[in-house]
């Protein structure tokens, strides 16, 4: 090959390489442009990702699927149809309680970033269930956990996190500044009620889908407080009960009807010998039933039921299987307050089925330890202490605490009835475990089923003290 041929050959190869390089660059530019277009596309665009569709509603991601394209998370969304939770169905027939969730938050918090909390509760929309809780503005195993045995402080807030997960700064959503709270979903949006402020002038702030819609001022100036569990929504209206007045004597109790976060009606109960605190409420066949805490003089639980016009009935659970703590040993009951060991109390719940009642209670009648569910087939109206079913949930050697009801509507479950459920708070630390400087809790929950269930103990299980306590 002569020199001219060599030059021509080398030149041809160089041109070919240049053309190939140019084509690769053009392809890369097209790829980057296409990726950018996907990422910045309209939020209303619907994408199919492994045959799963993500739903976006009211600024809350309901179902998540992430697809990695060039190391960038792309989320597709579309509107989800809202419904109106009717609450007209009856409670599902059940024979026992199946374990639903356990968050193990104290165990996880010994090493991870987990909030110091109390008063957890669960509430469900037609799409999902969420855990709500009152944080102390502090993390477990941190210096700010010191002194969190205190109930009311300006650092407390109502927050929510996915069901069954330990509440942390990474998975939790702020709802309201509050040291007493409630929340519920009407099928279109979340109503939250957060009470904060001084004991003699606290205010309940109402929010609907995160926007302040109203306030309720303390009317007795004696620690306005509410349920510490879910409110009840039926046919577009939500209902809650608040207490204002002494915790050891007659107080004032009001039912509020709320629509899209605004109070449309309220009444004060005429209940001079009753005491209602921290009510656990649920819908049943178009009415609201609330089972509450008598902190004044009853070791059996008071109840109030009302319709959507706020016409109400009141009473005490008659059964000799007493539901409060402290309480006497089971004996002859009463449809009025049972005053033996009636002072003080703990938040709890029951479910009424005709003349029968499922009673949730601590296993200990003096300490907040253990938990059990008891079916008394005549206990709503009869005063004997006979029962036919007892299901163990937490052993008497392990700490429990508050408990409360929540329900799953047919719009969520696909059933033709309202499924009854409950949660139990498992409190650890002060005041009973004085090797710690803090007070917090984890939680478990159960739902009613008409099939086989287990008798066991699902305790908190954390080993104390923590590093911060030593």
Curated annotation (Swiss-Prot):
Annotated positions binding Ca(2+): 294, 298, 324
A molecular function (GO) term: exo-alpha-sialidase activity
A single cellular component GO annotation: membrane
Residues glycosylated per entry: 44, 58, 63, 70, 88, 146, 235, 434, 455
Entry-linked SUPFAM superfamilies: Sialidases
Regulation of its function: Inhibited by the neuraminidase inhibitors zanamivir (Relenza) and oseltamivir (Tamiflu). These drugs interfere with the release of progeny virus from infected cells and are effective against all influenza strains. Resistance to neuraminidase inhibitors is quite rare.
Reaction equations catalysed: Hydrolysis of alpha-(2->3)-, alpha-(2->6)-, alpha-(2->8)- glycosidic linkages of terminal sialic acid residues in oligosaccharides, glycoproteins, glycolipids, colominic acid and synthetic substrates
Matches recorded under InterPro entries: Glyco_hydro_34, Sialidase_Influenza_A/B, Sialidase_sf
EC number(s) from the headed UniProt entry: 3.2.1.18
Cystine bridges: 92-417, 124-129, 184-231, 233-238, 279-292, 281-290, 318-335, 421-447
Note: The influenza A genome consist of 8 RNA segments. Genetic variation of hemagglutinin and/or neuraminidase genes results in the emergence of new influenza strains. The mechanism of variation can be the result of point mutations or the result of genetic reassortment between segments of two different strains.
The name this protein goes by in its record: Neuraminidase
Source organism phylogeny: Viruses, Riboviria, Orthornavirae, Negarnaviricota, Polyploviricotina
Gene that encodes the chain: NA
């Amino acid at each position: 090959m002569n020199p001219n041929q060599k030059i021509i050959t080398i030149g041809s190869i160089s041109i070919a390489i240049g053309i190939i390089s140019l084509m690769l660059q053009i392809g890369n530019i097209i790829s980057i442009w296409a990726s950018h277009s996907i990422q910045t596309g309209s939020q209303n665009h619907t994408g199919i990702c492994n045959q799963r569709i993500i739903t976006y509603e009211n600024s809350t991601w309901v179902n998540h699927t992430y697809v990695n394209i060039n190391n960038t998370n792309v989320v597709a969304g579309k509107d989800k149809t809202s419904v109106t939770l009717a609450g007209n169905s009856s409670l599902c027939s059940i024979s026992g309680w199946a374990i639903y969730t356990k968050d193990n938050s104290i165990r996880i918090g010994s090493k991870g970033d987990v909030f110091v909390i109390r008063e957890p509760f669960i509430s469900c929309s037609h799409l999902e269930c969420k855990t709500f809780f009152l944080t102390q503005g502090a993390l477990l195993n941190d210096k700010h956990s010191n002194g969190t045995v205190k109930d009311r402080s300006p650092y407390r807030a109502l927050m929510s996190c996915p069901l069954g997960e330990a509440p942390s700064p990474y998975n939790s959503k702020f709802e309201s500044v509050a040291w007493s709270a409630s929340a519920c979903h009407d099928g279109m949006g979340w109503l939250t009620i957060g009470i904060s402020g001084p004991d003699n002038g606290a205010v309940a702030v109402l929010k609907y889908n995160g926007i302040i819609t109203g306030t309720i001022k303390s009317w007795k100036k004696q620690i306005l407080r509410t349920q510490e569990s879910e409110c009840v929504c039926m046919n577009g209206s939500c209902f809650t009960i608040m207490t204002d007045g002494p915790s050891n004597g007659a107080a004032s109790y009001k039912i509020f009807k709320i629509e899209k976060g605004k109070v449309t009606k309220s009444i004060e109960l005429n209940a001079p010998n009753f005491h209602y605190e921290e009510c656990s409420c649920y819908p049943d066949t178009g009415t609201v039933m609330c089972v509450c805490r008598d902190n004044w003089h009853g070791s059996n639980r008071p109840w109030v039921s009302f319709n959507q016009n706020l016409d109400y009935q009141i009473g005490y659970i008659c059964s000799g299987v007493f539901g409060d703590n402290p309480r006497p040993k089971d004996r002859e009951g009463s449809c009025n307050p049972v005053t033996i060991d009636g002072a003080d109390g703990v938040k709890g719940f029951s479910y009424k089925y005709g003349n029968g009642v499922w009673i949730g209670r601590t296993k200990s009648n003096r300490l907040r330890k253990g938990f059990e569910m008891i079916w008394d087939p005549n206990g709503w109206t009869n005063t004997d202490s006979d029962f036919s079913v007892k299901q163990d949930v937490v052993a008497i050697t392990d700490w429990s605490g508050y408990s409360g009801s929540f329900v799953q509507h047919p719009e969520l479950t696909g059933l033709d009835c309202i499924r009854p459920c409950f949660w139990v708070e498992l409190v650890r630390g002060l005041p009973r475990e004085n090797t710690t400087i803090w007070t917090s809790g984890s939680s478990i929950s159960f739902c009613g089923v008409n099939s086989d269930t287990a008798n066991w103990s699902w305790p908190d299980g954390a080993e104390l003290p923590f590093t911060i306590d030593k």
